[in-house]
Amino acid sequence: PKFKKLGFIDIKGLYKTSPLATVSMFCTGIIHSALFSLGAVYAASINFTLFEISLLLCMITLAGGVFQWPVGYFSDRVDRRTIIVLCTSCAAIFCILAIVSSGTSLQNMHLAINIGIDKIMFFVYVTLYAGMAIPIFTLNLAYINDYIAKEKFVAAGGGMQIIFGLGAILGPFICSALMN
């Protein structure tokens, strides 16, 4: 788009404009970097073969791309906050189901959920998790753009990338500490 003048907005201004989008973007950075940096490590730790690990990462990436369309479609018709919360909630549920289905420590804590250790279900849950979690990045960008002037879209996008990056720096450290 052509703008007469590009505006400026700093991170503090982004937070004032939308605390939800900025905090959510930071958390999105954490989860995306943890997923893409340690997803393979986790799969290897539960004895997946090299092919299964490759397939898992392929499915994560495909789900993240494919789910952009339906999530984006609904976010254009329903309040974006609702979609952000819905995607986050669904991602959390699928994440828990993936952990339980992998047969790791959560299942050994006598959860009331009786889901067998099944690689296929693990693949399904992780794919659905990625499908819900990855589009949150674009939802946050769209949400912040709903509340700023067009001249600030580029600056807001850059600021949101920085916020995402700060979360992405922390993600692998937080996740690896929790995996131990």
Functional labels for PLM-detected ranges:
Residues 55-64, 160, 164:
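Transmembrane alpha-helical segments of major facilitator superfamily
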Residues 82-97:
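Structural signature of the two symmetry-related core transmembrane helices
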Residues 50, 148-160:
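Loop-to-transmembrane helix entry/capping segments in MFS-fold secondary transporters
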Residues 61-69, 168-169:
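Residue-level signature of mid-helix packing/kink "hotspots" within the transmembrane helices
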